[in-house]
Structure formats: C-alpha cells, structure tokens
Amino acid sequence: MKPQLLGFHHIAIIASNYTRSKHFYMEILGAKQLNETYRAERDSYKLDLSFPDGSQIELFSFPNPPPRVTTPEACGLRHLAFKVENIDEYVAYLLGKEVSCEPIRVDELTGMKYTFFRDPDYLPIELYENNY
C-alpha cells in the first residue's frame, strides 16, 4: 500500500528584515505565534506561526541571506496562497494597512476570485476566495 501525504505542514521563509516580516505576518496577516527561538551560534531567529486551519509558516532570520531571485517563472516556490471567505473585504483590509494589491481576477478554470500582493521581501502572496 502506498503511504499517503496528509497535506502541507509549513512553508519556510527567510526574511531580510526579521522584525519587519514578523510584524507583517502577525499584525497584518493575523498569524499567531507558536514559538520563537534565538539561536546564538547562528545569530538567527526561527519563528513558528500558525493560521486558523493549522497551516504554519516558519520565519527565519540569518545575518546575510542572499537576495531572492526576482524572475517569477524560475524553478522553485512560485508563490504562497491563502484562502479567504471574502476577497473584497480582505483586499480592502490590506489596502487600509498600505499593502498594495493587484486587481482582483477570476480564475477561468474554477470561477473563483483571486489576487496577489507581496510580503516585505517581495514574496508573491495570493489570496484565493474559498466558497466551499
């Protein structure tokens, strides 16, 4: 019998400015802190964040991380997507927090609304309206 994957446990993100990214994910996006660890030997932090559905983000800081490759179609993680109940309401909230969002579009395959914005390190983040 083939073993089964149960789903995603976490996404790991390396921040160029730990304090700014911690504020963004917790204060703007509403993630809850599970644990924060400072590792002196690495001069780095690891912050475990959680969302209501149990999904998690591990936010890391390192003294001199290399910059992110900006080509959006390069191999690797393309974007992070969050599901929301009302995309119009969430976009209005983000705009009120001075977070720029692309215009809301409709997925031609599913008929669901979606949009993109960026985190403090320009990681593309998608909002996807979840009506089911």
Predicted feature descriptions by range:
Residues 52-56, 64-65, 87:
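Short, charged/polar surface micro-motifs in flexible loops or helix N-caps
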Residues 59-60, 70-74, 78:
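Helix-adjacent hinge/juxtasegments
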Residues 34-36, 43-44, 64-70, 103:
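A short, acidic/glycine-rich surface segment
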Residues 7, 43-45, 76, 111:
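Exposed loop/turn and edge beta-strand positions of beta-sandwich/beta-sheet ligand-binding modules
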Residues 80-87:
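Mid-chain, well-packed structural core segment of small domains
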Residues 13-56:
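Core segments of cupin and vicinal oxygen chelate
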Residues 1-4, 37, 48, 91-132:
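Vicinal oxygen chelate
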Residues 1-19, 77-80, 131:
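N-terminal beta-strand motif that seeds the catalytic metal site of vicinal oxygen chelate
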